[in-house]
Amino acid sequence: TSKPVQNRELQGYESTDFXGYFKGGLKYKAGGVASGFNHVLTNXLSAQRLLHVKGRRVVRATEVPLSWDSFNKGDCFIIDLGSEIYQWFGSSCNKYERLKASQVATGIRDNERNGRSQLIVVEEG
């Protein structure tokens, strides 16, 4: 008889095997214990969140505070305002991260907004 196997993964340091289960990349949402596990409505067209997109092999979209202090010129960000989804590309971000950020933004539009959001590209500088 075989027994179940339990593995531990640390956020931001996930194993290749674990990350392989998420073909579209990983999304880290704000909340958890600190928020009291409050329900977040992702399908509402009134959503307001900022996602920091990083990674080459495994794309990680991490929810960060919606503030100019969160931005930097070396990375890509997605500003999700519900009916509009802005793809913000820093002046020093690489082509691969731009492509991945576009894929994440398209996924949000198609899967979380049922195609009802407008995608808008913004270049820094």
From Swiss-Prot:
Source domain of life: Eukaryota
Cross-referenced SMART domains: GEL
Keywords: Actin capping, Actin-binding, Calcium, Cell junction, Cell projection, Cytoplasm, Cytoskeleton, Phosphoprotein, Repeat
One Gene Ontology term, aspect cellular component: cell projection
Cystine crosslinks: none
Binding positions for a 1,2-diacyl-sn-glycero-3-phospho-(1D-myo-inositol-4,5-bisphosphate) per the UniProt entry: 23-30, 49-57
Pfam families per the UniProt record, alphabetical: Gelsolin
CDD domains linked: gelsolin_S2_like
SUPFAM superfamilies: Actin depolymerizing proteins
Listed GO MF terms: actin filament binding
Localization of this protein: Cytoplasm, Cytoskeleton; Cell projection, Podosome
Gelsolin-like repeat feature ranges: 59-99
Residue(s) carrying Phosphotyrosine: Y13
GO biological process: actin filament capping; regulation of chondrocyte differentiation
Transmembrane segments annotated in the record for this chain: none
PANTHER family, sorted: SCINDERIN, VILLIN
Similarity remark: Belongs to the villin/gelsolin family.
Cited function: Ca(2+)-dependent actin filament-severing protein that has a regulatory function in exocytosis by affecting the organization of the microfilament network underneath the plasma membrane. In vitro, also has barbed end capping and nucleating activities in the presence of Ca(2+). Severing activity is inhibited by phosphatidylinositol 4,5-bis-phosphate (PIP2). Required for megakaryocyte differentiation, maturation, polyploidization and apoptosis with the release of platelet-like particles. Plays a role in osteoclastogenesis (OCG) and actin cytoskeletal organization in osteoclasts.
UniProt-recorded name of the protein: Scinderin
